[in-house]
Amino acid sequence: MLKRILQYLSLCIVLVSLFILASCSSNSVSSQSKGPEGEWIAYSGYTVQNVVSAVDTPIFILNVKARNDSKTIYTVDMKAYNYQYTTPEKRPVIESTQMVGDIKEARLNYITALTLVMSANDIIGNSESSNPNTIKMDIRDIPNTDLIYDSKTDTIKFSDQTFKRVSDTNNLQTLADAYKKDLQVASNKYLEEVGNAANPKTKFITTYSFDDSIIKDNKK
């Protein structure tokens, strides 16, 4: 279920942000650009396909800073988090199995913790005055590293990820809570399908344990 990221490691190294436009309040006459600096976050969901492929979709966070007055050079700090097993075997704990009539019951315990799986600092990006909404990253051997800022939606798009600005309602804890719900739904659905196809049929009774202490540690 929660194996290490395979295809997203390269994405962690190249995800970068660019320009943020300030939103207008309902009573405001004019808008003002907030500039490129800021913290952004993205999570695109966890589905049965993630379970089947053993590839997780992490929560990505990036912090963008302008490095010159003209704001054409940026550096970005990037992090990626997902839930990893904390058991020595790095897999669910089988607590018990028993036959109940013709059906086998298996009790599983998923013991996991939100874990920092990728961190990269001071990634350099450049934008041109003729196209300020695109930042080209200085990263070797990785194609399609342009990041595009959409001023209409105030989002950053790169590959399959859409980044939104970090806020009180859109932050690591909020998305971690969403991740936990998605993970349980997807895993239970997958186990149901596996159990129905097994011989004898197996009913998985699953409990989940999520440790989010890394979030509290980061706030200290």
Per-region residue spans from a language model:
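Short, solvent-exposed loop/turn elements at domain surfaces
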Residues: 30-32, 47-52
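Bacterial N-terminal signal peptides that target proteins for export
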Residues: 2-11
